[in-house]
Amino acid sequence: VHPDRHAGPQAGHADRLTRITAVAPAVTFYTFALAIHIAAVVIAFGVTFAYPVMYAVGIRSEARSMPGVHRIQDSVGKFVISPFLGLALLAGIYLASKLHTWSDFYVQWGLGVILLLGALGGAFFAPRERKLAELAERDVAAAGSGEVSFSQEYKDLRKLVFRVGGVANVLILLTIYFMTAQTGA
């Protein structure tokens, strides 16, 4: 006969509580890290899906605002996207290490995409967004009080940034799918 059976209905309950409590902090921290990872991705990249709308509205109805739009993009890259990309990476490293999933496709894909997006942010988007601001400012100044007509140089660079941004957004969506489905796990 088990000794707890004679000690009443609550006997053994404290032991079970101790075992549950000992496991709970690890589960809670993992869940916290997962929430941080997801939130960091949403904060870092959510705005990038609004950029095409900002471009369209700016070009069509607020052409004089385009230098500011590009400066805002540059600042968002520095102060929102980059830091939260770093946080998503750190949380992802913890999650992959905790679950020992480094060899799974979705982890390798996610790591590759986050490193690529970080590199694109610093080496591609930031300098081109600053250049777009300069070109737009020049074109707005050249228009004087008349209608703004953007130069071909501005249009070509804006189109390039728009296309690369579109590819980046597709990579983000694919990564979300692969992570959710745990593709290759």
For the regions a language model picked out, list residue spans one by one.
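Polytopic transmembrane helical bundles with strong interfacial aromatic enrichment
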Residues: R16-A185
